[in-house]
Amino acid sequence: GPRSVYAATGDNLAVAAGRLSFVLGLQGPCVSVDTACSSALVALHSGALAIRAGECRSAVASAVGLKLAPQPTLGAAAAGMLSVDGRCKTWDKGANGYVRSEGVGSTVLRAVSDGASGALALSGSAVRQDGRSASLTAPNGSAQRGLLVAAMAVAGLEASAVGGVEAHGTGTALGDPTEAGSMAAAYCAGRESALAVGAAKAGIGHAEAASGMAGLCKVAQQLLRSAVAGNTKLRVLNPLVRERLGAGGAAALPSQPLASAGGACGLSSFGYSGSIAHMMLSVVGSS
């Protein structure tokens, strides 16, 4: 039968953000973001820019990843993206793809000058595009490296001030080594202490559009507790990942929790659309 007006608005991407503004009575910038897997971080980046531009005093950034139809899963399986044994083993030699999961998350951003002791500080972020790579959905290591360096520059940080990175880490044969190489190039040259690298997807799967929000929650807990979570399902490190990270312990991929990574933490989210995002996070009041 004919679609109801509720269905027409209920499954419209533009209305997803508009509905929040309607319910909360917000009149500032309101944008729905779809850059595939990087959507959450691009939304956070956009909210931070709006605050810095004086367009609003605070911003609500939300992300939703729901599996309401079988077609996307069938397509991802046909493309060889999904783990055949249903386990996302990021960084592991036996990694064979990711597992789709669901998630919903929301956060409020406001200027640090408003006062928020003990809160998480977004000191800098960057959004870029893979551009020309091996294929439309293939990662581009050079673009990733440029993204990480750009985010550090916005934050005014040197690589040595970054104690860890919450990586995109999909557990794919191409994605993991590529990302390891870009992190090593941006963060690991001349380090005196290892860069602690993690990925939430090994624990909860890939929430896709909401995956960046899951990463943000993990980074928040790590920074507020001064501890780095271990990489679940990591048994034998992928030789290509080891090679790209470099010799001499330039980066640590802990299978058990670490006491501390120290300093700021990077957070990555890469969309298979080619749109990629990275941000630098720390605790308000920390150096």
Predicted regions mapped to residue ranges:
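Condensing-enzyme catalytic core of the thiolase-fold
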Residues: G1-S287
